[in-house]
């Protein structure tokens, strides 16, 4: 990401701030579908509108937010005491009933919440009094506090997938949402954590990376997220600073496993041998990243180092593997097996220059071993219905507990549910490992389970993991309060942008 803060002109329609330090315009690439936590908005705590019972520090430690202290998590009952004096943006006091309502709405099957599976360990949430909330679990669940970052909404709130005014307890309150353009927020001067110095925040959305960089250079944004190569022109620009954040955010190719070519293990393994990950880091990420071989980031305690691949491609080994599996080279250089050419389509979101460049690199490397990859840059509405048929350059990743994302991406019960397990992967051993990791509280047993999970999906080459990114931010002006920490894939108003309530012009 890139964050730029200053007294520059506002984008069209945002209005000109009276004082630069009172208004910040953040240039973002991805607009949310909803601002409702029940429907998955910023469930991991990356929101300016909402608070959870707990929140994460930049170092990923958990600390109390709406809860007054971190509770004991032994057993199947976890009790939170709420912080006193907290009010919603509309003035209503926060009570235990609001917390119970929020989680109950997520768990209610009729609401079809996309994050419902994340809270499968919770049987119910009760509020015995105004300041007490009790999570009653189906089994001891080690990362339950990690799930307590969910933003809390007032009891009785309806699902707001459109632009209806959301209400939370966070440092900023909702003002307006112009779909396809911007969301405007105002400071919550009654915020329990202290009134923000920045009084107005505009989240300005531009999906195309190059267009967003151009708007940043033109001074339309006081902050913007950009891919690593796009920040190069800002590095030596007077008055701007580039910030790099370490992440668990990976890019890789999701294979539809029910198709003749991508469903062939030899094809998938050969591609993993053929691609030059180090070259991608150098040429595409401008050095702002590392090679990736799996969904659990190196350097995290849950990473299995046994799944790390070679530092350089081995295309001779890839060719041998394909030959032994019956994929023979044709006159046109494209391999075929039983009359089926080694050819498939790789989709990527059209406005994402980073994914486009990675897709081009994969296709180029694949061609060298006789695999023909056709590229298709599409919008997300066109991509989603094709995920069972065509490969996709995807991005995911979280530095939090390994139960996050991995269960939904690889457990067979989620096969084919939109962007959850889109490749329709089914493996009983992986299911058992993920279930053990989720339902066991013993750290050593969980580590063994997640090591087994990582090894199994590596052996199956379920995805072609390519790179872990650094999020790059550009900041114009001299500001205090900007804090960089380890970031997940979903970082919009989390990460560096999530600290905007602490930003102050440096004296």
Region locations from a protein language model:
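Aromatic- and charge-enriched surface segment that lines or borders ligand/interaction sites
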Residues: 68-112, 261-263
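Ligand/substrate-recognition segments at binding pockets and active sites
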Residues: 328-399
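N-terminal lobe/hinge region of extracytoplasmic solute-binding protein
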Residues: 27-74, 104, 167-168
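Gly/Pro-rich hinge or "lid" segments in bacterial periplasmic/extracellular proteins
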Residues: 146-196, 200, 210, 315, ...
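Surface-exposed binding/hinge segments that line
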Residues: 115-157, 176
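Ligand-site clamp/hinge motif
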Residues: 160, 188-234, 364, 372-374
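Structural transition elements
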Residues: 291-330, 350-355
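Detector for C-terminal structural segments
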Residues: 178, 275-304, 354-363, 384-507
């Amino acid at each position: 990401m890139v964050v730029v803060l200053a007294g520059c002109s506002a984008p069209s329609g945002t209005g000109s701030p009276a004082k630069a330090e009172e208004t910040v315009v953040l240039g973002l690439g991805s607009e949310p579908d909803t601002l409702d936590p029940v429907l998955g908005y910023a469930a991991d705590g990356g929101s300016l509108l909402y608070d959870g019972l707990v929140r994460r520090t930049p170092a990923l430690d958990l600390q109390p937010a709406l809860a007054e202290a971190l509770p004991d998590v032994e057993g199947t009952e976890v009790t939170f005491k709420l912080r006193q004096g907290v009010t919603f943006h509309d003035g209503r006091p926060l009570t235990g009933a609001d917390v119970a309502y929020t989680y109950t709405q997520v768990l209610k099957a009729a609401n079809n919440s996309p994050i419902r599976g994340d809270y499968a360990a919770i049987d119910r949430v009760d509020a015995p009094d105004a300041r007490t909330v009790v999570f009653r679990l189906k089994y001891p669940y080690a990362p339950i506090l990690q799930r307590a970052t969910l933003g809390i909404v007032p009891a009785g709130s309806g699902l707001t997938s459109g632009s209806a005014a959301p209400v939370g307890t966070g440092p900023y309150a909702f003002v307006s949402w112009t779909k396809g353009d911007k969301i405007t927020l105002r400071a919550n001067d009654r915020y329990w954590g202290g009134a923000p110095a920045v009084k107005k925040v505009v989240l300005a959305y531009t999906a195309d990376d190059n267009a967003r960089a151009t708007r940043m250079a033109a001074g339309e944004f006081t902050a913007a997220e950009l891919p690593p190569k796009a920040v190069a022109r800002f590095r030596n620009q007077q008055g701007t600073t580039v910030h790099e954040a370490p992440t668990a955010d990976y890019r890789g190719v999701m294979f539809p496993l029910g198709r003749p070519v991508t469903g062939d293990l030899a094809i998938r393994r050969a591609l993993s041998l053929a691609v030059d990950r180090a070259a991608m880091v150098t040429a595409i990420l401008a050095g702002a990243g590392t090679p990736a071989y799996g969904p659990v980031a190196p350097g995290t305690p849950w990473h299995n180092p046994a799944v790390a691949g070679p530092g350089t491609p081995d295309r001779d080994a890839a060719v041998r593997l394909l030959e032994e599996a019956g994929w023979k080279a044709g006159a046109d250089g494209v391999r075929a097996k039983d009359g089926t050419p080694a050819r498939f389509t790789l989709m990527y979101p059209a406005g994402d220059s980073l994914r486009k460049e990675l897709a081009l690199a994969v296709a180029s490397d694949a061609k060298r071993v006789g695999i023909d990859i056709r590229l298709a840059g599409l919008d997300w509405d066109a991509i989603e219905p094709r995920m069972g048929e065509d490969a996709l350059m995807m991005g995911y990743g979280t530095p939090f507990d390994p139960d996050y994302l991995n269960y939904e991406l690889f457990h067979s019960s989620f096969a084919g549910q939109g962007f959850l397990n889109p490749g329709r992967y089914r493996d009983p051993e992986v299911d058992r490992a993920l279930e053990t990791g989720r339902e066991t509280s013993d750290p050593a047993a969980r580590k063994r389970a997640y090591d087994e999970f990582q090894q199994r999906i590596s052996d199956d080459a379920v995805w072609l993991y390519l790179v872990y990114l650094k999020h790059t931010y550009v900041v114009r002006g001299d500001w205090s309060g900007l804090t960089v920490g380890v970031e997940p894939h979903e970082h919009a108003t989390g990460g560096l942008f999530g600290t905007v309530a602490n930003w102050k012009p440096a004296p």
